[in-house]
């Protein structure tokens, strides 16, 4: 027991007897769930008192059924609360926000309603306790007696420090000095009260009136219900007002009858004058009559059939009617406020409509503009009245919740927009978080032709038409529907909007600000390149529109001339199938063997797409026809897979040899697809059928596993080895026996017998290999070059723009503020900030760090003081320090081992060397002090 008690104390925490739960601690002890609710962390004690870790089943139950009061009523942390521990209340101390304690309080409120009705009734109509009613009173009193005891164990909120006080002594002292006396007095049984009171005060209900003290619980209940989102505020307020009215009528009726019942002359009372034998009448008739007079007095109707007959009743009526004045004012004020609040939106809408109409008439606006004004105001009222104030709601939420909502609603829609095809999910998530949903009524202008490009829109629902003004008349150029984007050309190219965008029906649009968009793209240059490619491709498809054709012509002209310092790669040009741009890039000295992160070169992409002109250009500029990617694939294999015969011929003439790639992989793929034509092509262009994959599996292994007799026979005809083992030691012959392929076993036996008798000649796979036609040509090794287009000055650099018609022509747009200019500036800034890590961007926009030679020409001076050479020699910096030491050995006929600066610091990395540095090559025996002395 001692050990168990120690464990319990450890679980409750070593915080001492006067420990109090802070506001920040209490808030951290409640975990807010996604459904807007929270659950209290287990506290010590039987009411959610865990033993340190807590019961998982209990936690799940609390999590599922936790009340929203934990958020609306729980303690909020003070600013800068530093406590990060989960404080637990003391043993046997109950949190006032515990779910089960809330249930207990709700149950007591039901008993309070009973007490509120029965206490005045017993006081006015019942002379002494009788049977069932007395028993029910005692049962109710017993429950409230339990609550008195329980209150001594409920923590309270200190109003000064806003901390939960869980010290039992302080809890007891606070309760004893506040409400304990009234709670005990209202719980005393009526029988006991009659015995202790004087004879003149031994009325059955006199002491019971103290139970009305419990009504304070009902007031707190209505306060909570008014804040509860699950209950309608209007009906909660109405229910509260009705309860107040009924309680006032009930109490007044009981007091009216009490005055008549206790008056010495029964006939001189309000009820005796109307009903002389009222004592003989049933309790129900007497109660209904009393309520009738009470409610007629409350409503000031006053039929005159019942009225005060003596002084006592007159005095009571005076105070009752004064009370009625205040109650009536309270009721009318509350109901007026509720009704006015419900109609305020309609009143504001009518006022706004009237003001807009007057404005249009006063300023003689065209009818179309007036209709647009009225439609917009009407739509705004409709969205507000139907609870669609989406932007106001989103703006009131934290950024994380707002982003999650936007992603859930619009992510898939934005992902399918042509402009963002192929970009990363991170970019789409950032864009969606910045978008704002808006509603537009039919026939409203969203974008005006020639206005400044500030926003572009994505259609969520509805349709819009693109209108161009020609000869003073509007002509519909195109109709856009859900999932399409409008206004993007003006925003991305930073030019006046080309068209007027007008809604055809009720539309929901996503608006994205140009500044926010370019800010996001500037930090995602690779994705910006993809967006640029998608835009150009879209514009090229709009050949029928002269305006769009002019835009794409100007963009491509600037790209080809190199006027934009953009991260354009050969892969980018080949992916678009733009042989003109590819030729311009190659003429400017870009490496034809540059690759992306997967090792794909431009020749790989051109071969797979079957673009003969791009393949021819790349081969002419020295692209390696046998370049391998990370999977061992070569361009010739890409062309064979796609059945591009002309490209295959070009590659073979350029020296392509399939054996440079992973022919084992190729043969296995052909067998898996059961493609005899592809397998014959592999063998014809230099593939070895006996070559294994990385796991040791050959094509014959694959054919046996698939039970493909046709492919196995074809492989055997070209020299496949039936006894070659894979990585696990299995041969094709053993696999055929193990898997029970009788046809293949028979084929193997017949082939072996024919080979042994010498009657069958097995052709070697090398006998059919095609000799390269251009093997003598020297090929440049493939490396990851920097795909950067240099700025070059041309005579035609200032050609006028031919995009807009003559009558709409503006001054020439420099594109510095367009998407292209932003990407260009961002790329240049990155190179300035990181000169040692310059790299290209592949067609997908992913960074491709340079793994080849240094692109910048760096000249350094090297000297060897040990050989008496201090003047030095000017040389180009090699790629590595080892190569630099080898160069020094050749220049000075000396074997240096270290590279030092003139100050004597040793150089460990070649990237630390800058253009113009003076380097000293020395051996391990060299004394740095000698160099300092000489210097």
Curated annotation (Swiss-Prot):
Gene3D superfamilies tied to this protein: 1.10.287.70, Ankyrin repeat-containing domain, Jelly Rolls
Cytoplasmic domain ranges by topology: 1-106, 158-178, 227-240, 334-935
Region (Disordered): 826-854
Entry GO terms, CC: monoatomic ion channel complex
Keyword vocabulary terms for this entry: ANK repeat, Ion channel, Ion transport, Membrane, Potassium, Potassium channel, Potassium transport, Repeat, Transmembrane, Transmembrane helix, Transport, Voltage-gated channel
Sequence ranges of Polar residues compositional bias: 845-854
KHA domain sequence ranges: 859-935
Protein name in UniProt: Potassium channel AKT1
Organism: Oryza sativa subsp. indica
Gene name linked to the record: AKT1
């Amino acid at each position: 027991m001692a050990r168990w008690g120690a464990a319990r104390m450890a679980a409750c925490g070593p915080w001492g007897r006067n420990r109090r739960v802070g506001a920040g601690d209490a808030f951290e002890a409640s975990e807010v769930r996604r459904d807007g609710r929270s659950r209290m962390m287990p506290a010590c004690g039987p009411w959610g008192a865990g033993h340190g870790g807590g019961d998982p089943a209990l936690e799940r139950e609390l999590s599922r059924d936790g009340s929203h009061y934990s958020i609306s009523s729980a303690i909020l942390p003070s600013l800068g609360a530093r406590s990060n521990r989960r404080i637990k209340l003391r043993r046997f101390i109950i949190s006032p926000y515990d779910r089960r304690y809330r249930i207990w309080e709700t149950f007591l409120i039901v008993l309070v309603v009973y007490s509120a009705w029965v206490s005045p009734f017993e006081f006015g109509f019942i002379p002494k306790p009788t049977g069932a009613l007395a028993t029910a009173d005692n049962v109710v009193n017993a429950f409230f007696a339990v609550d008195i005891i329980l209150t001594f164990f409920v923590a309270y909120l200190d109003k000064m420090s806003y901390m939960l006080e869980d010290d039992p002594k302080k809890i007891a002292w606070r309760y004893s000095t506040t409400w304990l006396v009234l709670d005990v007095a209202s719980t005393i049984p009526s029988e006991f009260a009659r015995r202790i009171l004087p004879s003149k005060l031994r009325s059955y209900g006199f002491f019971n009136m103290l139970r009305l003290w419990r009504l304070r619980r009902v007031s707190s209940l209505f306060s909570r219900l008014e804040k509860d989102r699950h209950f309608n505020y209007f009906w909660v307020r109405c229910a509260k007002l009705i309860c107040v009215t009924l309680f006032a009528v009930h109490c007044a009726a009981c007091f009216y009858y009490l005055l008549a019942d206790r008056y010495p002359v029964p006939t001189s009372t309000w009820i005796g004058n109307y009903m002389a034998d009222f004592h003989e009448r049933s309790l129900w008739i007497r109660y209904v009559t009393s309520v009738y007079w009470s409610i007629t007095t409350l409503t000031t109707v006053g039929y005159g059939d019942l009225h005060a007959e003596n002084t006592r009743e007159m005095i009571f009526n005076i105070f009752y009617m004064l009370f009625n004045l205040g109650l009536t004012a309270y009721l009318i004020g509350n109901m007026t406020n509720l009704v006015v609040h419900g109609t305020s939106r309609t009143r504001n809408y009518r006022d706004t409509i009237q003001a807009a109409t007057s404005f249009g008439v006063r300023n003689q606006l065209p009818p179309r503009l007036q209709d647009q004004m009225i439609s917009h105001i009407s739509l705004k009222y409709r969205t507000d009245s139907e609870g669609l104030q989406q932007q106001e709601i989103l703006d009131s939420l934290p950024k994380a919740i707002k982003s999650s909502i936007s992603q859930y609603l619009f992510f898939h829609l934005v992902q399918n927009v042509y402009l963002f095809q192929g970009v990363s999910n991170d970019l789409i998530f950032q864009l969606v978080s910045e978008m704002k949903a808006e509603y537009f009524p039919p026939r409203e202008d969203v974008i005006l032709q020639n206005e400044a490009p500030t926003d572009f829109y994505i259609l969520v629902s509805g349709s819009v038409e693109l209108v161009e003004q020609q000869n003073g008349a509007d002509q519909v150029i195109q109709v856009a529907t859900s999932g399409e984007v409008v206004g993007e050309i003006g925003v991305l190219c930073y030019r006046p909007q080309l068209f007027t965008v007008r809604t055809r029906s009720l539309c929901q649009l996503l608006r994205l600000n140009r500044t926010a968009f370019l800010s996001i793209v500037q930090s995602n240059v690779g994705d910006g390149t993809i967006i640029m490619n998608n835009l150009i491709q879209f514009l090229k498809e709009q050949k029928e529109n002269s305006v769009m054709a002019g835009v794409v012509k100007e963009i491509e002209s600037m790209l080809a001339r190199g006027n934009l310092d953009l991260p354009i790669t050969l892969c980018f040009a080949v992916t678009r199938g733009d042989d003109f741009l590819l030729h311009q890039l190659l003429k400017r000295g870009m490496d034809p063997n540059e690759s992306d992160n997967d090792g794909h070169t431009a020749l790989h992409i051109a071969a797979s797409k079957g673009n003969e002109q791009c393949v021819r250009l790349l081969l002419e500029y020295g692209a390696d026809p046998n370049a391998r990617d990370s999977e061992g694939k070569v361009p010739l294999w890409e062309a064979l897979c796609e059945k591009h015969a002309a490209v295959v011929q070009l590659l073979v003439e350029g020296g392509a040899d399939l054996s440079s790639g992973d022919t084992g992989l190729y043969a296995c793929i052909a067998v898996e697809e059961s493609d005899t034509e592809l397998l014959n092509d592999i063998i014809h262009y230099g593939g070895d059928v006996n070559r294994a994959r990385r796991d040791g599996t050959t094509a014959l292994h694959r054919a046996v596993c698939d039970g493909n007799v046709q492919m196995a026979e074809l492989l055997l005809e070209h020299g496949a080895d039936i006894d070659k083992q894979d990585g696990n030691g299995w041969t094709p012959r053993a696999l055929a026996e193990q898997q029970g392929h009788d046809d293949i076993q028979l084929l193997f036996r017949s082939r072996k017998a024919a080979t042994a008798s010498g009657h069958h000649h097995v052709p070697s796979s090398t006998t059919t290999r095609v000799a390269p036609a251009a093997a003598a040509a020297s090929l440049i090794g493939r490396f990851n070059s920097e795909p950067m287009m240099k700025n070059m000055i041309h005579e035609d650099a200032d050609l006028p723009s031919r995009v807009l018609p003559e009558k709409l022509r503006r001054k020439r747009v420099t594109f510095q503020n367009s998407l292209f200019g932003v990407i260009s500036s961002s790329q240049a800034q990155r190179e300035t900030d990181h000169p040692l890590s310059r790299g290209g961007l592949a067609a997908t926009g992913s960074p491709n760090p340079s793994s080849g030679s240094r692109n910048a020409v760096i000249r350094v001076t090297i000297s060897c003081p040990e050989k008496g050479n201090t003047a030095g020699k000017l040389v180009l910096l090699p790629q590595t320090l080892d190569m630099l030491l080898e160069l020094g050995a050749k220049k000075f006929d000396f074997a240096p081992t270290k590279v030092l600066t003139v100050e004597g610091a040793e150089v460990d990395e070649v990237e630390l060397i800058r253009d113009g540095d003076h380097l000293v090559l020395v051996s391990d025996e060299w004394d740095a002090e000698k160099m300092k002395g000489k210097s």
